[in-house]
Amino acid sequence: MAMITRNTATRLPLVLQSHRAAAVSHLHTSLPALSPATTPTSYTRPGPPSTSAPPPGLSKTAEFVISKVDDLMNWARRGSIWPMTFGLACCAVEMMHTGAARYDLDRFGIIFRPSPRQSDCMIVAGTLTNKMAPALRKVYDQMPEPRWVISMGSCANGGGYYHYSYSVVRGCDRIVPVDIYVPGCPPTAEALLYGLLQLQKKINRRKDFLHWWNK
């Protein structure tokens, strides 16, 4: 009986080792190869949307007519800018110089008007104080659409020399939206004239009739 038990104890580790070797031999030693059909395709980033493409459902004839109407409206607007004089400080002297005979703004169709209801542009020239700010906004609200604002001089742009004063607005763009900034203290007449010409270019890029058509 002791002999049988001894033989069984010695053979058991050998049997376990043989079964383990057989199980390991059935394992895959290498990864299966991928077929060509399962290879991932390369990712292509889509391009940005085109801003010059016509709206969907708009024919070529309608697109041509709409663009010509916009061109006609922009031509009339940029050729008849009527500024509202809002001189507040020494920059107003240069604004008056620009409107005088030497530079002759009339040849550009720019005519100063005394009433905001007859104007489509406001030239804020000078230092805007906290007490004058409500009046500026009231005059701006009386102007018909479309309307534009030119900030003339360092004081109107950001407070200028009086930036840290308790009674000065640090930029008229805190009260009304500004389209053109003319730097300088004070700016020359040529600088204001250049700002008006830039405003004409900005008006020429408007697409009011197209936006109205797509509503």
Curated annotation (Swiss-Prot):
Cofactor: how and how many bound: Binds 1 [4Fe-4S] cluster.
Disordered: region residues: 32-58
Segments of skewed composition (Pro residues): 46-57
InterPro entries from the UniProt entry: NADH_UbQ_OxRdtase-like_20kDa (IPR006137), NADH_UQ_OxRdtase_20Kd_su (IPR006138)
Cofactor field: [4Fe-4S] cluster
Keyword Oxidoreductase in record: yes
Primary site of residence: mitochondrion
UniProt EC number: 7.1.1.2
Keywords from the UniProt entry: 4Fe-4S, Electron transport, Iron, Iron-sulfur, Metal-binding, Mitochondrion, NAD, Oxidoreductase, Respiratory chain, Transit peptide, Translocase, Transport, Ubiquinone
GO molecular function, one term: quinone binding
Amino acids binding [4Fe-4S] cluster: C90, C91, C155, C185
Organism domain of life: Eukaryota
Compartment(s) where it occurs, according to its Swiss-Prot or TrEMBL record: Mitochondrion
Biological-process GO terms, alphabetical: aerobic respiration; electron transport coupled proton transport; mitochondrial respiratory chain complex I assembly
Function of the protein: Core subunit of the mitochondrial membrane respiratory chain NADH dehydrogenase (Complex I) that is believed to belong to the minimal assembly required for catalysis. Complex I functions in the transfer of electrons from NADH to the respiratory chain. The immediate electron acceptor for the enzyme is believed to be ubiquinone.
Family to which the UniProt record says this protein belongs: Belongs to the complex I 20 kDa subunit family.
NCBIfam families: nuoB_fam, PRK06411.1
PANTHER family: NADH DEHYDROGENASE (PTHR11995), NADH DEHYDROGENASE [UBIQUINONE] IRON-SULFUR PROTEIN 7, MITOCHONDRIAL (PTHR11995:SF14)
Name listed for the protein in its UniProt record: NADH dehydrogenase [ubiquinone] iron-sulfur protein 7, mitochondrial
